[in-house]
Design a protein with these regions (language model features):
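Acidic, carboxylate-rich catalytic segments that either coordinate divalent cations
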Residues: 276-295
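A basic- and aromatic-enriched beta-loop-alpha substructure that forms the phosphate/nucleotide-
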Residues: 99-178
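Helical scaffold of the NTase/Pol beta-like nucleotidyltransferase catalytic core
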Residues: 27-68
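Catalytic metal-binding acidic patch
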Residues: 71-112
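Conserved nucleotidyltransferase catalytic core and NTase-mimicking acidic/glycine-rich helix/loop elements
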Residues: 154-281
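Methionine residue identity
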Residues: 1, 25-26
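Short hydrophobic alpha-helical segments enriched in small aliphatic residues
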Residues: 13-16, 20
């Protein structure tokens, strides 16, 4: 049974530490200098996003349980011209789940110059959680939340860690890092944002290999938990400053310290440690789905 949606927080502050933040994120222990991190959400765009979510609910007859930012605004290093990557989870009324033929389980809005909006149906999301899908796990820990059913999402986040399989996360992030490094960082002049698109997944691999569990979505938190070299931290922070003040297409000469670190990390990560299978029980996901759909 679909429940009435609670009143949603509507704070427009730019930083992840305030009410735009996901309240379920673990706090970062500051043992080394922190790199900069900003999550700018224009109040006018936020209102437009909420209006889009409302329109999706009306057009498709669904309830959006959760909507968050999934791209650079969630990672904490958006450029002035970065778009908004909005991702959401939704549930249908009970009748939808009682049909013999499979139904479409994705909703996608046409991409425009500002918004990229798409979402997954809850059963699909739970199937992906059972398979330890890193993308879904990142969504659940986004520091920028546009809407959520607090009770349902608290329960879902409580289930998620038991389904995290380190080797799957490791393969996902290492593949992402290699693809971006080989595709964009081989010339003497490089697109600076691609450094961050390699550093983020490589540090996620380091986080996993350190036994810390699912890597955080916030890049600053990821750096704080995996990098303690002050010179390297300064290099990363300078790279972030360039990314945040320049456009998405900013090019410049290679940054030798960052480049050397990436090459060393790729060599270091090119192995498969032994990890235990996740201990999550799929019956818990079945019960969760039943509770949300049937009330």
């Amino acid at each position: 049974m679909l429940k009435e949606r609670p009143a949603w927080a509507n704070n427009h502050s730019a930083y992840a530490r305030n009410h735009n933040s996901n309240p379920h994120m673990m706090p970062t222990t500051k043992t080394t200098p922190m790199v900069r991190s900003e999550h700018p959400i224009d109040p006018t765009v936020r209102e437009r996003i909420i209006a889009e979510i409302d329109a999706i609910e009306r057009a498709h007859g669904v309830q959006v349980l959760y909507a968050c930012e999934s791209g650079s605004r969630g990672w904490g290093f958006a450029s002035p011209d970065s778009d908004y990557d909005v991702r959401f989870l939704y549930v249908h009324p009970l009748d939808w789940y009682l049909r013999v033929e499979p139904q479409r389980d994705v909703i996608e809005k046409p991409i425009d110059d500002e918004l990229d909006v798409s979402g997954w149906e809850l059963r699909k999301a739970l199937q992906l959680l059972h398979r330890s899908n890193p993308t879904l796990l990142e969504w659940l820990n986004s520091p920028v939340v546009y809407r959520q059913d607090a009770h349902i999402m608290s329960d879902l986040r409580g289930l998620a860690p038991s389904f995290f399989y380190p080797i799957k996360g490791r393969h996902h992030y290492l593949s992402m890092a290699k693809k971006n490094f080989r595709g964009y960082l081989q010339d003497e002049t490089v697109r600076y944002k691609k450094y961050l698109y390699v550093l983020r997944p490589l540090l996620a691999v380091r986080w996993i290999d350190a036994g810390k569990g699912m890597p955080p979505m916030r890049f600053a938190e990821l750096v704080a938990g995996t990098v303690d070299d002050h010179a390297l931290l300064s290099e990363i922070d300078e790279l972030l400053a360039i990314k945040m003040r320049a456009g998405e297409a900013e090019y410049g000469p290679r940054r030798p310290a960052i480049h050397a670190f990436i090459e060393a990390m790729l060599a270091e990560a090119d192995h498969d440690p032994q990890y235990k299978q996740p201990q999550g029980d799929p019956a818990d996901l079945d019960r969760f789905l039943h509770r949300v759909v049937c009330g």
